[in-house]
């Protein structure tokens, strides 16, 4: 009441239903020595969400804040843990996430109000030990043709690309639910003081943010020490403030396609319905070769005449203008992308 509801500038706009519940027996072992059960997770999610909505109906509820892919699959963390509630129904679903969404949808019907606004999961790359792996890591989020070289792939490959599978479940079991990654890092988090100062981390973050846009992610929160990662900061700024004056990637995604995602990723946008300017983010993943990217804008009635190229390179994490073209013709631009 003091701060106001979620619609005010001082109110709390969102609430998370705790954090990484299947790890409670490890992270909060004195309070919760046993692994959380399916029944406990669902009932506590409903109870807490209903309490918040009773106080502030405009607030968004985020949950269940799973630590990664495995809880989405089986609702638990330990290989030897068996939940009889989940085992009794799991044959009806592809993975545990489907069941959780079903339960929250049924809770809305019972309580007369939505009790889960945003499905929230954390994501940390499992194949990130080398530069080569980090350059491809974001593809596990959105590229159906990619298979990462991690311990997850042989056992759980059917759940990749991860964001695509999450959104498919939402669309089927609880349409209208938003998707968030309130913790994510696709770099080598344990070695970020070194990797964060390498241009590879910029390419990884750039493609990750593009994948979020491509897959309709509502909210994402980078987990790491950004003061140690100037290249990651610049990658974020490519989308939010690339000219230092507030210029940003557009809010409407334009269909784009790379001929080979192993070599280059591409994402394009416009601002609203304004097609006068197209903003494109490109990456060159080669460590040795300059890539000449030909950007062709098909299907537009506009005739584009100029282009400005901003870049992050290995020489500096600063975003700099590396090319200005005032002779664009046939809606086609060629851009030289330096190697790493």
Regions found by a protein language model. Give the residues of each.
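Noncatalytic carbohydrate-binding groove/subsite architecture in carbohydrate-active enzymes
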Residues: 2-3, 13, 38-200
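Extracellular/periplasmic catalytic domains that process cell-envelope and extracellular macromolecules
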Residues: 7-10, 16, 54-56, 110-115, ...
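Flexible loop/turn segments at secondary-structure boundaries
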Residues: 21-25, 68-72, 125-130, 186-193, ...
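Catalytic cores of eukaryotic secretory-pathway lumenal/extracellular enzymes that build
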Residues: 25-35, 75
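Extended hydrophobic-aromatic, low-complexity segments
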Residues: 178, 190-191, 248, 278-281, ...
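Glycan-recognition and catalytic regions of carbohydrate-active enzymes
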Residues: 198, 209-279, 315-319
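Carbohydrate-binding surface patches
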Residues: 260-303, 340
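Acidic, Ser/Thr/Pro-rich beta/coil linker or hinge segments at domain junctions
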Residues: 301-339
């Amino acid at each position: 009441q003091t701060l106001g509801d979620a619609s005010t500038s001082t109110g709390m706009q969102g609430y998370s239903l705790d954090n990484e519940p299947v790890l409670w027996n490890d992270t909060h072992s004195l309070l919760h020595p046993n692994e959380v059960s399916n029944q406990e997770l669902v009932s506590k999610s409903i109870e807490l969400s209903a309490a918040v909505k009773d106080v502030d109906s405009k607030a968004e509820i985020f949950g269940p804040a799973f630590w990664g892919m495995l809880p989405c699959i089986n609702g638990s963390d330990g290989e030897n843990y068996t939940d009889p509630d989940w085992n009794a129904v799991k044959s009806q679903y592809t993975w545990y996430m489907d069941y959780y969404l079903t339960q929250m949808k049924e809770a809305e019907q019972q309580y007369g109000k939505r009790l889960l606004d945003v499905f929230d999961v954390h994501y940390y790359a499992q194949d990130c030990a080398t530069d080569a792996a980090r350059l491809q890591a974001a593809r596990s989020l959105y590229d159906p043709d990619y298979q990462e070289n991690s311990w997850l792939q042989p056992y759980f490959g059917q759940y990749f690309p991860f964001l695509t599978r999450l959104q498919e479940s939402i669309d089927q079991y609880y349409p209208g639910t938003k998707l968030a990654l309130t913790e994510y890092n696709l770099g080598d988090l344990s070695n970020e003081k070194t990797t964060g100062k390498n241009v590879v981390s910029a390419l990884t973050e750039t493609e990750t943010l593009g994948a979020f846009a491509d897959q309709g992610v509502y909210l994402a929160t980078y987990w790491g020490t950004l003061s140690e990662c100037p290249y990651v900061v610049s990658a974020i700024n490519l989308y939010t403030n690339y000219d230092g004056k507030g210029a940003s990637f557009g809010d409407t995604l334009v269909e784009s396609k790379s001929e080979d995602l192993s070599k280059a990723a591409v994402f394009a946008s416009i601002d609203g319905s304004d097609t006068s300017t197209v903003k494109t983010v490109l990456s060159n993943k080669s460590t040795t070769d300059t890539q000449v990217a030909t950007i062709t804008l098909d299907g537009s009635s506009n005739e584009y005449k100029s282009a400005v190229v901003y870049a992050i390179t290995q020489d500096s994490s600063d975003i700099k203008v590396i090319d200005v073209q005032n002779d664009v013709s046939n809606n086609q631009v060629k851009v030289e992308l330096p190697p790493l």
